[in-house]
Amino acid sequence: MPLNTEKKQELINSHQTHATDTGSVEVQVAMLSERITQLTGHLQSNKHDYSSRQGLMKMLGRRKSLLGYLKSQSSERYDTLIQKLGIRG
């Protein structure tokens, strides 16, 4: 379930650090969080979709490691991102 182009551009615009930023940690975590939210909804209605569940676990691990990196680099950026996305840190 990839993100559609409009949603992806909206996420990039709301989390980018400068005008041409598309790959910063904040943008990557925001896109992963959106995909995790979509996949969680899919798995609530399709409980036996084990391959999607495995993909969800990979995404959660990737987001966790990116957040750990961001926290080690700048705790202020980490805190604002956590609040903006509404996720647990």
From Swiss-Prot:
Extent of Polar residues compositional bias: 11-22
Recorded superkingdom: Bacteria
- Record-level GO cellular component terms: cytosolic small ribosomal subunit
Against Gene3D superfamilies, the record matches this protein to: 6.10.250.3130, S15/NS1, RNA-binding (1.10.287.10)
InterPro entries in the cross-refs: Ribosomal_uS15 (IPR000589), Ribosomal_uS15_bac-type (IPR005290), uS15_NS1_RNA-bd_sf (IPR009068)
Pfam families, alphabetized: Ribosomal_S15
Molecular function (GO) terms for this protein are: rRNA binding; structural constituent of ribosome
Disordered: annotated span: 1-22
Q: Which UniProt keywords apply?
A: Ribonucleoprotein, Ribosomal protein, RNA-binding, rRNA-binding
Q: Which GO terms describe its biological process?
A: translation
| Basic and acidic residues biased stretches | 1-10
- Quaternary organization: Part of the 30S ribosomal subunit. Forms a bridge to the 50S subunit in the 70S ribosome, contacting the 23S rRNA.
Under the heading NCBIfam families, the entry gives: S15_bact (TIGR00952)
- Provide the function of this protein: One of the primary rRNA binding proteins, it binds directly to 16S rRNA where it helps nucleate assembly of the platform of the 30S subunit by binding and bridging several RNA helices of the 16S rRNA.
Name of the molecule in the record = Small ribosomal subunit protein uS15
The gene designation is rpsO
